């Protein structure tokens, strides 16, 4: 990446984070003085934050792991190959709630896709996330897997609300990236996320994804336009 590309990426990242912070803090009726305090707190944290070497080591470990096959097994979760006969109903339930429906967001058609359309597409690879006791909690996917160009779009979802924000999404995503890079031979994994979803953006950056651009007013849901942030992981 040259200096110009790095400058553009940094500008996009700063703009994205700023918009996300404004959207979140507006819910708490922040005043000018509150934003000044927030800016000072960010500056203080930037000076004292831990080294990024541990995160870089984590990324290297993900990309250098051995080839995996189903079921993919981690410390707290497993990912098994999606089974239409046993998994369809529970996944379809997840995809009908406010968070789950983003998994079905289509950038290729005038409407959202359906679970049936996703699993009928031979270029889509789906995996069911479970706890170690086989309790289903979420879904991973590689969409439009391109063997010739070694790339695919990644999507993830923790469908059960009580299992969100507990680290399961990160562990499952690491397993899925390992499977994609070391078994499927992917050289690029990309994803799209709502630009003000700071939690998701942070998780993706921790796993090596970099901001590639902002798609302005890319989707229209509940009578509101949303900007999408595109992020990519390149395997050298």
Language model features with spans:
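Short, charge-rich amphipathic interface segments used for partner binding and complex assembly
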Residues: 28-59
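Short loop/turn motifs at secondary-structure junctions and domain boundaries
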Residues: 118-123, 209
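Short amphipathic alpha-helix that is part of the acyltransferase structural core
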Residues: 77-105
């Amino acid at each position: 990446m040259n200096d110009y590309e790095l400058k553009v990426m940094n500008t996009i990242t700063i703009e994205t984070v700023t918009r996300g912070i404004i959207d979140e803090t507006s819910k708490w009726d922040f005043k000018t003085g509150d934003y000044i305090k927030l800016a000072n707190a960010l500056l203080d944290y930037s000076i004292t934050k831990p080294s990024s070497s541990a995160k870089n080591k984590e990324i290297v470990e993900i990309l250098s792991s051995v080839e995996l096959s189903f079921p993919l097994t981690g410390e707290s979760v497993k990912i098994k190959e999606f089974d239409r006969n046993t998994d369809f109903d529970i996944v379809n339930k997840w995809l009908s709630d406010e968070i789950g429906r983003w998994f079905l967001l289509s950038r290729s058609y005038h409407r959202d896709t359906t679970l049936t359309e996703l699993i009928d597409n031979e270029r889509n690879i789906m995996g069911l996330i479970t706890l170690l006791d086989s309790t289903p909690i979420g879904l991973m996917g590689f969409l439009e897997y391109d063997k010739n160009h070694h790339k695919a779009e990644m999507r993830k979802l923790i469908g059960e609300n009580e299992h969100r924000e507990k680290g399961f999404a990160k562990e499952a995503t690491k397993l899925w990236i390992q499977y994609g890079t070391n078994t499927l031979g992917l050289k690029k994994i990309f994803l799209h996320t709502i630009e003000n979803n700071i939690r998701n953006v942070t998780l993706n950056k921790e796993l090596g994804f970099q901001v590639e651009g902002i798609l302005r007013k890319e989707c229209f849901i509940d009578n509101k336009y949303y900007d999408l942030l595109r992020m990519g992981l390149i395997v050298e």
